[in-house]
Amino acid sequence: MMPRLQEKYEKEVVSALMDKFGYKNIMEVPKLEKIVINMGVGEAKENQKSLEAAVEDLAKITGQKPILTKAKKSVANFKIREDMPLGCKVTLRKQNMYEFADKLINVALPRVRDFSGVSSKSFDGRGNYAIGIKEQLIFPEIEFDKIDKIRGMDIIFVTTAKTDEEARELLRFLGMPFAR
């Protein structure tokens, strides 16, 4: 069964984007390529348990096992050594990606306190969009009394769009609530 958001993309978004930007070929239409969710756990250098908890939370949220991210080089001021695990990340593609995007847009973001939309300035110039989330509690899979600490995460939407404007329209048509 095709995820709801993927169906919406194929049935409505493609034609809307073709009209708006005047693409001649359906393959030119930008699409979501992947969603990368990254959780940096600063206190992992002293406390390995916190990293395990972060991995568990991320696995619950995404339904996929995260990989550990390690320090690229040693930095004495931060008390980190090379190859020390400092966080975790998940890369979602295809069905998992659409299901996660649907859950984020329709369930998680509306649960953010004082939510007025996501910033439309977080594009990187190459058609990718990044959003920071301050607490993992906005996801329905996370139970308040089961977590040890509130953690945030970065979510990056990687699209095939050439420009930020095309990427913004793609995400807007998919339902991303941009602030006015």
From Swiss-Prot:
Pfam families reported for this sequence: Ribosomal_L5, Ribosomal_L5_C
GO biological process: translation
Keyword tRNA-binding: yes
Signal peptide from the UniProt entry: none
InterPro entries in UniProt: Ribosomal_uL5 (IPR002132), Ribosomal_uL5_bac-type (IPR020930), Ribosomal_uL5_C (IPR031309), Ribosomal_uL5_CS (IPR020929), Ribosomal_uL5_dom_sf (IPR022803), Ribosomal_uL5_N (IPR031310)
GO cellular component terms, semicolon-separated: cytosolic large ribosomal subunit
PROSITE patterns from the UniProt entry: RIBOSOMAL_L5
Keyword RNA-binding in annotation: yes
GO molecular function: RNA binding; rRNA binding; structural constituent of ribosome; tRNA binding
Subunit structure: Part of the 50S ribosomal subunit; part of the 5S rRNA/L5/L18/L25 subcomplex. Contacts the 5S rRNA and the P site tRNA. Forms a bridge to the 30S subunit in the 70S ribosome.
Assigned protein family: Belongs to the universal ribosomal protein uL5 family.
Function as written in the Swiss-Prot or TrEMBL entry: This is one of the proteins that bind and probably mediate the attachment of the 5S RNA into the large ribosomal subunit, where it forms part of the central protuberance. In the 70S ribosome it contacts protein S13 of the 30S subunit (bridge B1b), connecting the 2 subunits; this bridge is implicated in subunit movement. Contacts the P site tRNA; the 5S rRNA and some of its associated proteins might help stabilize positioning of ribosome-bound tRNAs.
Protein name: Large ribosomal subunit protein uL5
Organism: Clostridium botulinum (strain Hall / ATCC 3502 / NCTC 13319 / Type A)
Phylogenetic classification of the source organism: Bacteria, Bacillati, Bacillota, Clostridia, Eubacteriales
Encoding gene per record: rplE
